[in-house]
Amino acid sequence: PEPLPYLWLTLEQNLFDKESTGALMWGKGLRFGNRDGFDGGYDIPRVTLLQPTGGSQQLLKLDVYDTVGRIDLPTPVAARGGEVNFEVEYAFDLPPYGSDRMGVEKVEQGTIFQLAQWFPAVCAFDDVHGWNTLPYLGAGEFHTNFGDCEIALTVPRDHIVGATGELLAHLIDKDGQLA
């Protein structure tokens, strides 16, 4: 409905940072808290603007505010059909216990690593309220957009990955890992 000079990202994984609003609200040891001293949250070393013509890529600054982050764009995304492509490099630690759609669980056949929806995504935007930048506090669901994401996973060869979507590539890296 209007040009967008910046984008907001949901960073829900930051709920597990011991200083997040949600972690402080819920306290230690509770469902959304940081059990056993676990201090989570994203490590986001880089956000890159991808040029559609294959030109030089541009690093973008991400300002993080608890469980959301703002990216100021060099050129606004045009209204009514504009498009911007960018890449977010990120990582986060999994707690050594199951916690709200993520965690590590040891079972008789091995270990299950559960990641679910924990990836940065563009916040919902509408022409009535604008950006939905409410912090994620753990309880309840979140308001999201539908869209396409390309996710790259690198896992050891003996791991099984369960996911929705379409497998785009089946590569083996130099260390014999499936990528």
Predicted features along the sequence, with ranges:
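Short Gly/aromatic-enriched secondary-structure transition segments
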Residues: 5-12, 23-26, 103, 166-172
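Short strand-edge motifs at loop-to-beta-strand transitions and within beta-strands
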Residues: 67-71, 82-84
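Extended, low-hydrophobicity, Ser/Thr/Pro/Gly-biased non-transmembrane segments
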Residues: 31-46, 50-52, 61, 72, ...
